[in-house]
């Protein structure tokens, strides 16, 4: 689950931040079942660009515009040949989410198979450079002995309905599946089913027969998918012993407008103003068109925003403000109460912030082919049908927020709650950093491992980086014109009514204010605590690049690019972090993500910022000699030669 504050990192008496008793959540009770104990193992390897073996033979050129032309099939062939050369005995399938990013890198993803069955946590991603050769690659393929017996021959596995019952009982899921009512209906794919006749889930549960790489071997499992609101789970149930769960992945992480404008983080930083036609010209349409209609409400191609006071999964018929003239101006002040009295302003603010962020990310490369959130992809690649569902004042919780990220083609879902640590209570929709944090979970999950694979941040350190990326983008976007590297920032300060925010330390380049180092992750089990370390490193990176390239005009929304490269350090940092997500392997660790960011800069600027990047990471212990180990990390302040 990708919530803003589900963390033991706070060391606060405010345990309401982690599914409070006041919440009417339908998700997994974290006091009863700790689903984090079922995380996927962290087994990926990443071969960075300067470690890729020398390549001979023909090459092709990717298009920096991302156009799919004759060469588009060639980069897939090059990637496939590289996999065959690297792992000649492996069997696999091509995942249908390859694309050429706007930085000119071709991204191709493969899934390992055995007896025609997916080994679900095995991935091989190949990044093809502008010169047509392999730029870098990641690998988590299983290299052990494949079971000799084909389970499909003797049908040596349980009925999928039994696996569904196993998932429900083991995880105490709020799903009812009476044996006499439940039917497993086959759908497209081998041993792939949808369950009919259940209740309690937001959509029909599903199951697929897969292998899972675990403890040095392969276990045949049913991958059971259940969306129960606060948790959208993939539960890997043993295909023979249905009371045994091997692993769990959670997809959830949580005109004219009168709003707090872009760059104003919360009501303490500025006043509401009227914004005219705020959308950026990234597409040929505005925010209220999806190719099927023009909606005089908070609905369009990128998002649909509404109130949800009951916390119910239904959203299409929920209340949202309407304006035939597209004038969304409604009263609000932080002193107003109850929250329902300003619901129109809340929904409008949420719709505005999310759409602006969508447009900024689009310019920086998170577009249709990369798996962004849009109903209509305008024939530009990727899978459509997946705008972001935005719930304002969601009644399923308080003092939090979350975002669920299923694979490309299925809508993301953001739940924004009210916060009761102040009088009157506060609405998280008016703190842009919370909205941006949650939406960024959708971004990092879609980019890492490819748009069709939403389980690539399910390991502990990977999930921690997911939280860190979300804090980083929220912080980078709120920078002010007078800020310097001596400026510190908090997260969630306004909504939580806590002057120091909701993280252990402020984000700061001062090691006195924020002493976090890489090795601090040892012993941590909270993704939010680990994420604070990662975001602290990225904050150093941000200021190193700003000091070199300037921060640009922070009052302007649209990033300025020259030959595809942002001209200011702030957006350049955001760009190479985004590109790094697409380069890194599935289930990355800090070291691999650092290398992917270095590779992103190498591709984008020919490595002109190499030393600035290394200095940022080395300052906080992720230098040349740093090494990942789940329980005992090796820190390093060493810089490479020349830096």
Swiss-Prot record:
<feature type="region of interest" description="Disordered">
    <location>
        <begin position="49"/>
        <end position="69"/>
    </location>
</feature>
<keyword id="KW-0325">Glycoprotein</keyword>
<dbReference type="Pfam" id="PF07504">
    <property type="entry name" value="FTP"/>
</dbReference>
<dbReference type="InterPro" id="IPR027268">
    <property type="entry name" value="Peptidase_M4/M1_CTD_sf"/>
</dbReference>
<protein>
    <recommendedName>
        <fullName>Probable extracellular metalloproteinase 4</fullName>
        <ecNumber>3.4.24.-</ecNumber>
    </recommendedName>
</protein>
<feature type="active site">
    <location>
        <position position="438"/>
    </location>
</feature>
<keyword id="KW-0964">Secreted</keyword>
<keyword id="KW-0732">Signal</keyword>
<dbReference type="Pfam" id="PF02128">
    <property type="entry name" value="Peptidase_M36"/>
</dbReference>
<feature type="glycosylation site" description="N-linked (GlcNAc...) asparagine">
    <location>
        <position position="603"/>
    </location>
</feature>
<keyword id="KW-0479">Metal-binding</keyword>
<keyword id="KW-0645">Protease</keyword>
<dbReference type="InterPro" id="IPR050371">
    <property type="entry name" value="Fungal_virulence_M36"/>
</dbReference>
<keyword id="KW-0482">Metalloprotease</keyword>
<dbReference type="GO" id="GO:0006508">
    <property type="term" value="P:proteolysis"/>
</dbReference>
<comment type="similarity">
    <text>Belongs to the peptidase M36 family.</text>
</comment>
<dbReference type="GO" id="GO:0004222">
    <property type="term" value="F:metalloendopeptidase activity"/>
</dbReference>
<keyword id="KW-0843">Virulence</keyword>
<dbReference type="InterPro" id="IPR001842">
    <property type="entry name" value="Peptidase_M36"/>
</dbReference>
<dbReference type="GO" id="GO:0008270">
    <property type="term" value="F:zinc ion binding"/>
</dbReference>
<feature type="compositionally biased region" description="Polar residues">
    <location>
        <begin position="58"/>
        <end position="69"/>
    </location>
</feature>
<feature type="signal peptide">
    <location>
        <begin position="1"/>
        <end position="18"/>
    </location>
</feature>
<feature type="propeptide">
    <location>
        <begin position="19"/>
        <end position="254"/>
    </location>
</feature>
<comment type="function">
    <text>Secreted metalloproteinase probably acting as a virulence factor.</text>
</comment>
<dbReference type="GO" id="GO:0005576">
    <property type="term" value="C:extracellular region"/>
</dbReference>
<feature type="glycosylation site" description="N-linked (GlcNAc...) asparagine">
    <location>
        <position position="420"/>
    </location>
</feature>
<keyword id="KW-0862">Zinc</keyword>
<keyword id="KW-0378">Hydrolase</keyword>
<keyword id="KW-0865">Zymogen</keyword>
<dbReference type="InterPro" id="IPR011096">
    <property type="entry name" value="FTP_domain"/>
</dbReference>
<feature type="glycosylation site" description="N-linked (GlcNAc...) asparagine">
    <location>
        <position position="629"/>
    </location>
</feature>
<feature type="glycosylation site" description="N-linked (GlcNAc...) asparagine">
    <location>
        <position position="271"/>
    </location>
</feature>
<feature type="binding site">
    <location>
        <position position="441"/>
    </location>
    <ligand>
        <name>Zn(2+)</name>
    </ligand>
</feature>
<feature type="binding site">
    <location>
        <position position="437"/>
    </location>
    <ligand>
        <name>Zn(2+)</name>
    </ligand>
</feature>
């Amino acid at each position: 689950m990708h919530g803003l504050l589900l963390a033991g990192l706070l060391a606060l008496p405010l345990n309401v931040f982690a599914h409070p008793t006041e919440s009417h959540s339908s998700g997994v009770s974290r006091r009863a079942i700790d689903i984090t104990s079922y995380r996927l193992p962290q087994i990926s390897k990443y071969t960075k660009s300067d470690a890729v073996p020398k390549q001979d033979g023909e090459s092709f050129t990717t298009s920096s515009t991302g156009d799919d032309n004759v060469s588009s099939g060639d980069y897939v062939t090059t990637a496939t040949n590289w996999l065959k050369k690297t792992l000649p005995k492996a069997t696999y399938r091509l995942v249908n989410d390859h694309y050429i990013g706007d930085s000119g890198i071709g991204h191709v993803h493969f899934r390992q198979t055995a007896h025609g069955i997916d080994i679900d946590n095995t991935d091989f991603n190949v990044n093809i450079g502008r010169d047509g050769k392999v730029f870098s690659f990641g690998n988590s393929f299983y290299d052990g002995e494949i079971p000799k017996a084909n389970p499909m021959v003797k049908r040596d596995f349980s009925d999928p309905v039994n696996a569904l019952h196993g998932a429900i009982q083991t995880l105490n899921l709020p799903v009812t599946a009476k044996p006499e009512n439940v039917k497993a209906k086959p759908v497209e794919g081998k041993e792939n089913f949808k369950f009919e006749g259940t209740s309690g889930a937001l959509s029909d549960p599903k199951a697929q027969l897969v292998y899972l790489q675990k403890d040095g071997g392969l276990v045949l499992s049913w991958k059971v998918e259940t969306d129960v609101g606060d948790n959208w789970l993939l539960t890997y149930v043993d295909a023979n012993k249905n009371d045994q769960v091997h692993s769990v992945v959670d997809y959830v992480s949580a005109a004219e407008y009168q709003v707090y404008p872009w760059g104003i983080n919360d009501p303490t930083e500025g006043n509401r103003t009227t914004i005219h036609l705020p959308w950026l010209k990234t597409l040929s349409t505005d925010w209220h068109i999806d190719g099927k209609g023009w909606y005089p409400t908070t609905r369009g191609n990128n998002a649909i925003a509404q109130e949800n006071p009951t916390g119910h999964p239904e959203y299409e018929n929920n209340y949202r403000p309407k304006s035939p003239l597209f004038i969304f101006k409604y009263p609000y002040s932080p002193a107003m109460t109850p929250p329902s009295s300003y619901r129109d302003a809340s929904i409008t603010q949420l719709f505005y912030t999310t759409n602006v962020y969508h447009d900024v990310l689009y310019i920086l490369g998170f577009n249709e082919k990369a798996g962004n959130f849009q109903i209509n992809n305008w024939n530009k690649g990727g899978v459509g049908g997946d705008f972001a569902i935005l719930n304002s004042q969601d009644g399923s919780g308080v003092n939090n927020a979350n975002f669920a990220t299923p694979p490309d083609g299925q809508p993301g879902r953001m739940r924004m709650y009210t916060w009761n640590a102040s009088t009157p209570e506060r609405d998280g929709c008016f703190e842009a950093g919370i909205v941006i944090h949650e939406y960024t979970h959708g971004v990092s999950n879609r980019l890492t491992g490819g748009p069709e694979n939403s389980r690539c941040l399910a390991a502990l350190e990977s999930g921690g980086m997911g939280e860190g990326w979300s804090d980083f983008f929220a912080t980078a976007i709120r920078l002010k014109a007078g800020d310097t590297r001596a400026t510190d920032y908090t997260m969630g300060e306004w909504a939580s009514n806590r002057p120091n925010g909701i993280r252990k330390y402020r984000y700061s380049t001062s090691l006195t204010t924020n002493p976090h180092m890489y090795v601090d992750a040892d012993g941590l089990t909270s993704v939010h605590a680990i994420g604070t370390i990662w975001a602290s490193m990225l904050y150093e990176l941000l200021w190193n690049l700003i000091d070199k390239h300037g921060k640009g005009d922070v009052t302007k929304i649209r990033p300025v690019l020259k030959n595809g490269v942002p001209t200011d350090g702030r957006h350049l940092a955001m760009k190479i972090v985004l590109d790094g997500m697409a380069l890194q392997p599935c289930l990355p660790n800090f070291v691999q993500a650092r290398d992917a960011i270095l590779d992103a800069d190498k591709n984008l600027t020919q490595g002109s910022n190499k030393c600035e990047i290394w200095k940022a990471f080395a300052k906080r212990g992720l230098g040349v000699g740093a090494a990942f180990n789940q329980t005992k990390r090796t820190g390093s302040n060493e810089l490479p030669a020349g830096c």
